[in-house]
Amino acid sequence: MTKLTVKDLDLKGKKVLMRVDFNVPIKDGVIGNDNRVVAALPTIKYVLEQGGKAILFSHLGRIKKAEDKPGLSLAPVAKHLSDLLNQEVVFPGKTEGKELEDAIDKLKDGQVLMVENTRYEDVDANGEYVKRESGNDPELGKYWADLGDDLFVNDAFGTAHRSHASNVGIASNVSKTAAGFLMEKEIKYLDEAVNNPKRPFVAVLGGAKVSDKIEVIKNLLSKADKVIVGGGMSYTFSNAKGVKIGNSLFEADKVSLAKEIMKEAGDKLVLPEDSVAAESFANDVPTKVFENGIPDGWMGLDIGPKTIEKFKNTLKGAKTVVWNGPMGVFEMSNFANGTLELGKFIGSLTSEGAATIVGGGDSTAAVSQLGIADQFTHISTGGGASLEYLEGKTLPGIAAISDK
């Protein structure tokens, strides 16, 4: 996929519109985790070093009524970004209007301005939920596009699966849209892994629900050499095989689909053989390992030791690994072992030359919490976006980037 990147643009003296993903957790004005802000720094710094004027757009949270606005201002993010860049970030606190336009006109080369939360535009002056941003209102996309010099850099992979005014809307009103470094990296690793992998290619899928991952399982079964399924969703497959699952979470309406997938997949699909179970959903209760089924009154909350070994054997020698979703309830220490062991093992394959990609969402949180994030080739910043990419879908935010 050869898309235009920020390095292909002449930025000197230009007002460069940039979509970043600064949708970070904020409590009482304090940012909880600034990973997304830090991830955008290389692209922002590059634009400034090239003598461009960076005009940043991002959403923060969801805004459905006027009362949502004050707690979801990007002001704390602008302040934090100015600390990280060691320079002022101009923040007029507006999404449109004369004050914003004047502030942009006053920018000098190498300066940064942040537009207020783009989702402020989802609620109008009368408090009506009009979704101008998230509904990709054509007038808003054109208005924002006109604030710059016909250049747009999209570095927000986390919103690439959405068609909003601040990504697709701006892109459709400028002649050149380029990928920022973060977007470029995401496309490179996910695209290569799914469409041109070094083999053997093993996909590892976890998480609670089969329904969330059906399309991913189907797409990856057609591309990977093996697909490992663990986590809560594996109990729907166990039930479909006629194995007792006790009180474990499963989706009754997906059992026939699980049967169908198993029949089509044959030995390509690798499923757990044992579980760590408890009598209630809590960390401080006695646990037991069950093989070949879980008795009534017990619920499976992590993969067991035999399964860990089985999955490691499947992964041995893999040259590409895509991992999406934890193997158990990793937030509770008693049920984190499967995710930790498998994570460490996948991490060790990186040093043997494998491309190891963690595909967003819970698995990203898991590797960070377990302190093993630095052991992988690439950790995706997009939850829903990486999932849809792994499903084989075309993401509107990426489709809107100009081809070289």
Curated annotation (Swiss-Prot):
ATP binds at residues 213, 300, 331, 360-363. It is found in: Cytoplasm. Substrate binds at residues 21-23, 36, 59-62, 119, 162. Pathway: Carbohydrate degradation; glycolysis; pyruvate from D-glyceraldehyde 3-phosphate: step 2/5. InterPro entries: Phosphoglycerate_kinase (IPR001576), Phosphoglycerate_kinase_CS (IPR015911), Phosphoglycerate_kinase_N (IPR015824), Phosphoglycerate_kinase_sf (IPR036043). It catalyses: (2R)-3-phosphoglycerate + ATP = (2R)-3-phospho-glyceroyl phosphate + ADP. One of its GO terms (biological process) is gluconeogenesis. GO terms for molecular function: ADP binding; ATP binding; phosphoglycerate kinase activity. It holds the Pfam family PGK. One of its GO terms (cellular component) is cytosol. Monomer. Belongs to the phosphoglycerate kinase family. This is Phosphoglycerate kinase.
